[in-house]
Amino acid sequence: MAPSNLPESTTPAEVPAPYGTGPAAAAQAASAAGRKPISRVRIHHLQQAKDNGEHFAMLTAYEQYTAEIFDQAGIEVLLVGDSASNNVYGNETSLPVTVDELLPLTRAVSRSAKRALIVADLPFGSYEVSPGQAVATGVRFLKEGLAHAVKIEGTAYYADTVRAMVQAGIPVMAHIGFTPQSEHSLGGYRVQGRGDDAQRLVDDAVALQDAGAFSVLMEMVPAETAAAVDAALRVPTVGIGAGKTTTGQVLVWQDMAGLRGGKMAKFVKQYADLRTTLSDAAAAYGEDVRSGQFPGPEHSF
Protein backbone atom coordinates (compact mmCIF):
# COMPACT_ATOMS: atom_id res chain seq x y z
CA MET A 1 0.00 0.00 0.00
CA ALA A 2 1.51 3.32 -1.02
CA PRO A 3 1.88 5.91 1.74
CA SER A 4 -0.69 8.65 1.69
CA ASN A 5 -0.13 12.38 1.55
CA LEU A 6 -2.22 13.52 4.50
CA PRO A 7 -2.97 17.26 4.37
CA GLU A 8 -1.86 19.73 7.00
CA SER A 9 -4.96 21.84 6.57
CA THR A 10 -7.36 21.55 3.69
CA THR A 11 -10.97 21.13 2.63
CA PRO A 12 -12.27 18.06 0.77
CA ALA A 13 -12.35 19.93 -2.55
CA GLU A 14 -8.66 20.79 -2.26
CA VAL A 15 -7.36 17.27 -1.63
CA PRO A 16 -5.08 15.94 -4.39
CA ALA A 17 -4.52 12.26 -5.12
CA PRO A 18 -3.17 11.00 -1.78
CA TYR A 19 -0.60 8.49 -2.98
CA GLY A 20 3.14 9.12 -3.10
CA THR A 21 6.33 7.24 -2.39
CA GLY A 22 7.20 8.61 1.01
CA PRO A 23 7.86 11.97 2.65
CA ALA A 24 9.68 13.41 -0.38
CA ALA A 25 6.72 12.77 -2.67
CA ALA A 26 4.35 13.98 0.02
CA ALA A 27 6.31 17.21 0.39
CA GLN A 28 6.32 17.78 -3.37
CA ALA A 29 2.57 17.18 -3.62
CA ALA A 30 1.91 19.48 -0.69
CA SER A 31 4.07 22.20 -2.22
CA ALA A 32 2.28 21.89 -5.57
CA ALA A 33 -1.06 22.25 -3.78
CA GLY A 34 0.16 25.28 -1.84
CA ARG A 35 0.08 23.42 1.47
CA LYS A 36 2.66 22.98 4.20
CA PRO A 37 4.08 19.42 4.23
CA ILE A 38 3.56 17.39 7.39
CA SER A 39 6.60 17.28 9.64
CA ARG A 40 4.89 15.03 12.21
CA VAL A 41 1.73 12.98 11.72
CA ARG A 42 -0.83 13.85 14.37
CA ILE A 43 -4.20 12.44 15.34
CA HIS A 44 -6.00 15.22 13.49
CA HIS A 45 -4.26 14.20 10.26
CA LEU A 46 -5.83 10.74 10.58
CA GLN A 47 -9.20 12.38 11.14
CA GLN A 48 -8.69 14.49 8.03
CA ALA A 49 -7.98 11.30 6.09
CA LYS A 50 -11.32 9.89 7.24
CA ASP A 51 -13.15 13.11 6.43
CA ASN A 52 -11.58 13.37 2.98
CA GLY A 53 -11.90 9.73 1.94
CA GLU A 54 -8.14 9.14 2.02
CA HIS A 55 -6.19 6.24 3.49
CA PHE A 56 -3.13 5.82 5.70
CA ALA A 57 -0.72 2.96 6.33
CA MET A 58 0.27 1.50 9.68
CA LEU A 59 2.97 -1.08 10.48
CA THR A 60 4.32 -2.58 13.66
CA ALA A 61 7.85 -1.63 14.70
CA TYR A 62 9.87 -2.73 17.70
CA GLU A 63 13.34 -1.23 17.35
CA GLN A 64 15.45 1.52 15.79
CA TYR A 65 16.20 0.38 12.26
CA THR A 66 12.75 -0.77 11.20
CA ALA A 67 11.29 2.37 12.76
CA GLU A 68 13.69 4.53 10.72
CA ILE A 69 13.07 2.59 7.51
CA PHE A 70 9.28 2.59 7.77
CA ASP A 71 9.23 6.24 8.83
CA GLN A 72 11.40 7.27 5.88
CA ALA A 73 9.21 5.17 3.56
CA GLY A 74 6.26 7.34 4.53
CA ILE A 75 4.31 4.98 6.79
CA GLU A 76 2.03 7.29 8.75
CA VAL A 77 1.54 5.25 11.95
CA LEU A 78 3.91 2.88 13.74
CA LEU A 79 2.45 0.46 16.29
CA VAL A 80 4.64 -0.91 19.05
CA GLY A 81 2.36 -3.88 19.47
CA ASP A 82 2.05 -6.48 22.16
CA SER A 83 2.75 -8.71 19.16
CA ALA A 84 6.35 -8.13 20.24
CA SER A 85 5.59 -11.03 22.56
CA ASN A 86 5.52 -13.33 19.51
CA ASN A 87 7.88 -11.46 17.21
CA VAL A 88 10.61 -10.28 19.59
CA TYR A 89 10.45 -12.32 22.78
CA GLY A 90 9.64 -15.72 21.28
CA ASN A 91 6.34 -16.40 23.05
CA GLU A 92 3.51 -18.30 21.36
CA THR A 93 0.90 -15.62 22.15
CA SER A 94 0.74 -11.94 23.07
CA LEU A 95 -0.37 -12.70 26.63
CA PRO A 96 3.01 -13.05 28.44
CA VAL A 97 4.56 -9.72 27.41
CA THR A 98 4.75 -7.10 30.17
CA VAL A 99 4.76 -3.33 30.45
CA ASP A 100 8.43 -3.38 31.42
CA GLU A 101 9.25 -5.40 28.29
CA LEU A 102 7.30 -3.13 25.93
CA LEU A 103 8.47 0.22 27.30
CA PRO A 104 12.09 -0.04 26.03
CA LEU A 105 10.84 -1.06 22.58
CA THR A 106 8.40 1.85 22.52
CA ARG A 107 11.15 4.26 23.54
CA ALA A 108 13.45 2.99 20.78
CA VAL A 109 10.77 3.41 18.10
CA SER A 110 9.72 6.83 19.38
CA ARG A 111 13.31 8.09 19.36
CA SER A 112 13.95 6.77 15.86
CA ALA A 113 10.84 7.80 13.90
CA LYS A 114 10.75 11.53 13.17
CA ARG A 115 7.46 11.80 11.26
CA ALA A 116 5.17 8.88 12.09
CA LEU A 117 2.57 8.81 14.85
CA ILE A 118 3.66 6.27 17.48
CA VAL A 119 0.97 4.12 19.08
CA ALA A 120 1.80 1.63 21.85
CA ASP A 121 -0.26 -1.37 22.92
CA LEU A 122 -1.19 -1.72 26.56
CA PRO A 123 -0.40 -5.37 27.30
CA PHE A 124 -2.73 -7.88 28.91
CA GLY A 125 -3.13 -7.28 32.63
CA SER A 126 -2.10 -3.63 32.54
CA TYR A 127 -5.51 -1.94 32.17
CA GLU A 128 -8.34 -4.40 32.88
CA VAL A 129 -8.53 -4.02 36.67
CA SER A 130 -9.85 -0.46 36.70
CA PRO A 131 -9.85 2.82 34.77
CA GLY A 132 -7.29 4.04 37.29
CA GLN A 133 -4.92 1.21 36.42
CA ALA A 134 -5.35 1.98 32.72
CA VAL A 135 -4.58 5.67 33.27
CA ALA A 136 -1.45 4.82 35.26
CA THR A 137 -0.22 2.44 32.57
CA GLY A 138 -1.04 4.86 29.77
CA VAL A 139 0.88 7.63 31.51
CA ARG A 140 3.95 5.38 31.64
CA PHE A 141 3.80 4.72 27.90
CA LEU A 142 3.55 8.43 27.08
CA LYS A 143 6.04 9.58 29.72
CA GLU A 144 8.62 6.76 29.73
CA GLY A 145 7.95 5.22 26.32
CA LEU A 146 7.55 8.58 24.54
CA ALA A 147 4.52 7.22 22.65
CA HIS A 148 1.95 9.61 21.21
CA ALA A 149 -1.06 7.37 21.88
CA VAL A 150 -1.97 3.94 23.22
CA LYS A 151 -4.20 1.10 22.02
CA ILE A 152 -6.40 -1.10 24.16
CA GLU A 153 -8.48 -4.13 23.24
CA GLY A 154 -12.07 -4.61 24.30
CA THR A 155 -15.79 -4.10 23.91
CA ALA A 156 -18.14 -1.33 25.02
CA TYR A 157 -17.44 -2.57 28.55
CA TYR A 158 -14.22 -0.54 28.37
CA ALA A 159 -15.93 2.73 27.46
CA ASP A 160 -15.43 4.10 30.98
CA THR A 161 -11.76 3.10 30.81
CA VAL A 162 -11.31 4.93 27.50
CA ARG A 163 -13.13 7.97 28.88
CA ALA A 164 -10.89 8.12 31.96
CA MET A 165 -7.72 7.82 29.87
CA VAL A 166 -8.78 10.50 27.41
CA GLN A 167 -9.73 12.84 30.24
CA ALA A 168 -6.24 12.26 31.66
CA GLY A 169 -4.71 13.40 28.37
CA ILE A 170 -3.95 9.98 26.90
CA PRO A 171 -5.09 9.51 23.28
CA VAL A 172 -6.66 6.07 22.84
CA MET A 173 -7.11 3.82 19.81
CA ALA A 174 -9.69 1.11 20.51
CA HIS A 175 -9.32 -2.45 19.17
CA ILE A 176 -12.41 -4.57 18.50
CA GLY A 177 -13.31 -7.73 16.59
CA PHE A 178 -10.79 -10.46 17.21
CA THR A 179 -8.74 -9.32 20.18
CA PRO A 180 -5.65 -11.50 20.65
CA GLN A 181 -5.48 -10.86 24.39
CA SER A 182 -8.89 -12.59 24.66
CA GLU A 183 -8.04 -15.55 22.43
CA HIS A 184 -8.88 -18.09 25.13
CA SER A 185 -12.31 -16.65 25.86
CA LEU A 186 -12.99 -16.25 22.13
CA GLY A 187 -12.12 -19.87 21.40
CA GLY A 188 -8.93 -19.22 19.46
CA TYR A 189 -8.19 -17.23 16.33
CA ARG A 190 -11.67 -16.85 14.85
CA VAL A 191 -13.36 -14.24 12.66
CA GLN A 192 -15.68 -12.01 14.71
CA GLY A 193 -18.79 -10.05 13.71
CA ARG A 194 -20.61 -12.58 11.58
CA GLY A 195 -24.40 -12.77 11.44
CA ASP A 196 -26.17 -11.45 14.53
CA ASP A 197 -22.81 -10.51 16.07
CA ALA A 198 -22.28 -7.78 13.47
CA GLN A 199 -24.55 -5.29 15.23
CA ARG A 200 -22.71 -5.86 18.50
CA LEU A 201 -19.46 -4.77 16.86
CA VAL A 202 -21.14 -1.63 15.51
CA ASP A 203 -22.48 -0.86 18.99
CA ASP A 204 -19.08 -1.50 20.60
CA ALA A 205 -17.35 0.79 18.12
CA VAL A 206 -19.84 3.62 18.61
CA ALA A 207 -19.61 3.34 22.40
CA LEU A 208 -15.81 3.48 22.33
CA GLN A 209 -15.85 6.41 19.90
CA ASP A 210 -18.31 8.28 22.08
CA ALA A 211 -16.07 7.63 25.09
CA GLY A 212 -13.29 9.51 23.29
CA ALA A 213 -11.33 6.97 21.23
CA PHE A 214 -9.70 8.80 18.31
CA SER A 215 -9.73 5.66 16.14
CA VAL A 216 -11.13 2.13 16.12
CA LEU A 217 -9.07 -0.81 14.87
CA MET A 218 -10.90 -3.92 13.65
CA GLU A 219 -9.20 -7.31 13.38
CA MET A 220 -10.53 -10.38 11.52
CA VAL A 221 -13.95 -8.92 10.79
CA PRO A 222 -16.00 -9.65 7.64
CA ALA A 223 -15.66 -6.86 5.08
CA GLU A 224 -19.40 -6.16 5.17
CA THR A 225 -19.40 -5.79 8.95
CA ALA A 226 -16.29 -3.59 8.86
CA ALA A 227 -17.98 -1.36 6.29
CA ALA A 228 -20.99 -1.00 8.58
CA VAL A 229 -18.74 -0.08 11.50
CA ASP A 230 -16.84 2.45 9.40
CA ALA A 231 -20.08 4.03 8.19
CA ALA A 232 -21.37 4.33 11.76
CA LEU A 233 -18.28 6.16 13.04
CA ARG A 234 -17.06 9.73 12.80
CA VAL A 235 -13.50 8.71 13.70
CA PRO A 236 -11.07 6.87 11.40
CA THR A 237 -10.98 3.09 11.37
CA VAL A 238 -8.00 0.78 10.90
CA GLY A 239 -8.30 -2.72 9.53
CA ILE A 240 -6.32 -5.93 9.70
CA GLY A 241 -8.30 -8.60 7.94
CA ALA A 242 -11.28 -6.23 7.79
CA GLY A 243 -11.71 -5.45 4.10
CA LYS A 244 -10.82 -2.27 2.25
CA THR A 245 -13.33 0.30 3.53
CA THR A 246 -11.33 1.26 6.61
CA THR A 247 -9.40 4.52 6.65
CA GLY A 248 -6.14 2.78 7.53
CA GLN A 249 -4.59 -0.67 7.18
CA VAL A 250 -2.12 -2.32 9.54
CA LEU A 251 0.10 -5.38 9.26
CA VAL A 252 2.78 -6.94 11.44
CA TRP A 253 5.96 -5.97 9.65
CA GLN A 254 7.52 -9.44 9.79
CA ASP A 255 4.48 -10.76 7.91
CA MET A 256 4.49 -7.91 5.39
CA ALA A 257 8.20 -8.37 4.66
CA GLY A 258 8.27 -12.18 4.69
CA LEU A 259 10.53 -12.59 7.69
CA ARG A 260 8.33 -14.97 9.67
CA GLY A 261 8.11 -17.78 7.13
CA GLY A 262 5.51 -20.52 7.09
CA LYS A 263 1.83 -20.17 6.31
CA MET A 264 0.50 -16.62 6.45
CA ALA A 265 -2.96 -15.49 7.51
CA LYS A 266 -5.39 -14.87 4.66
CA PHE A 267 -5.31 -11.11 5.24
CA VAL A 268 -1.51 -10.82 4.84
CA LYS A 269 0.06 -9.58 1.63
CA GLN A 270 3.78 -10.36 1.54
CA TYR A 271 5.87 -7.65 -0.13
CA ALA A 272 9.32 -9.23 0.27
CA ASP A 273 11.08 -12.46 1.26
CA LEU A 274 13.46 -11.28 3.95
CA ARG A 275 13.69 -14.70 5.56
CA THR A 276 15.31 -16.14 2.42
CA THR A 277 17.47 -13.04 1.92
CA LEU A 278 18.84 -13.15 5.47
CA SER A 279 19.27 -16.92 5.42
CA ASP A 280 21.25 -16.74 2.17
CA ALA A 281 23.39 -13.89 3.51
CA ALA A 282 24.15 -15.73 6.76
CA ALA A 283 24.98 -18.94 4.90
CA ALA A 284 27.33 -17.09 2.52
CA TYR A 285 29.05 -15.36 5.45
CA GLY A 286 29.49 -18.64 7.29
CA GLU A 287 30.97 -20.31 4.21
CA ASP A 288 33.39 -17.42 3.64
CA VAL A 289 34.59 -17.61 7.24
CA ARG A 290 35.04 -21.39 7.20
CA SER A 291 36.85 -21.29 3.84
CA GLY A 292 39.15 -18.47 4.87
CA GLN A 293 37.82 -16.00 2.29
CA PHE A 294 36.67 -13.57 4.98
CA PRO A 295 38.20 -11.37 6.17
CA GLY A 296 40.27 -10.49 3.13
CA PRO A 297 43.04 -7.90 2.81
CA GLU A 298 40.47 -5.19 2.12
CA HIS A 299 38.87 -5.85 5.52
CA SER A 300 42.10 -5.70 7.51
CA PHE A 301 44.07 -2.79 8.97
From Swiss-Prot:
Q: Which reaction does it catalyse?
A: 3-methyl-2-oxobutanoate + (6R)-5,10-methylene-5,6,7,8-tetrahydrofolate + H2O = 2-dehydropantoate + (6S)-5,6,7,8-tetrahydrofolate
Q: Does the keyword Cytoplasm apply?
A: yes
Provide the top EC class. Answer: transferase
* Polar residues composition bias: residue spans: 1-12
Enzyme active site: 219 (proton acceptor)
Q: Which UniProt keywords apply?
A: Cytoplasm, Magnesium, Metal-binding, Pantothenate biosynthesis, Transferase
Instruction: Enumerate the residues binding 3-methyl-2-oxobutanoate.
Output: 82-83, 121, 151
Give the matching Pfam families.
Pantoate_transf (PF02548)
Enzyme Commission number(s) of this protein: 2.1.2.11
Could you say which residues bind Mg(2+) here?
82, 121, 153
Quote the pathway field: Cofactor biosynthesis; (R)-pantothenate biosynthesis; (R)-pantoate from 3-methyl-2-oxobutanoate: step 1/2
According to its UniProt record, where is this protein located? Cytoplasm
Instruction: List membrane-spanning regions.
Output: none
State any GO BP term from the record: pantothenate biosynthetic process
Q: Where is this region: Disordered?
A: 1-24
The cofactor remark states: Binds 1 Mg(2+) ion per subunit.
Q: Which GO terms describe its cellular component?
A: cytoplasm
Q: Does the keyword Cell cycle apply?
A: no
MF terms per GO, please? Answer: 3-methyl-2-oxobutanoate hydroxymethyltransferase activity; magnesium ion binding
Query: Which co-factor is required?
Result: Mg(2+)
Described function: Catalyzes the reversible reaction in which hydroxymethyl group from 5,10-methylenetetrahydrofolate is transferred onto alpha-ketoisovalerate to form ketopantoate.
**Which family, according to the similarity comment?**
Belongs to the PanB family.
Q: How does it assemble?
A: Homodecamer; pentamer of dimers.
- Protein's name in the database: 3-methyl-2-oxobutanoate hydroxymethyltransferase
Write down the species.
Answer: Paenarthrobacter aurescens (strain TC1)
Question: Gene symbol?
Answer: panB
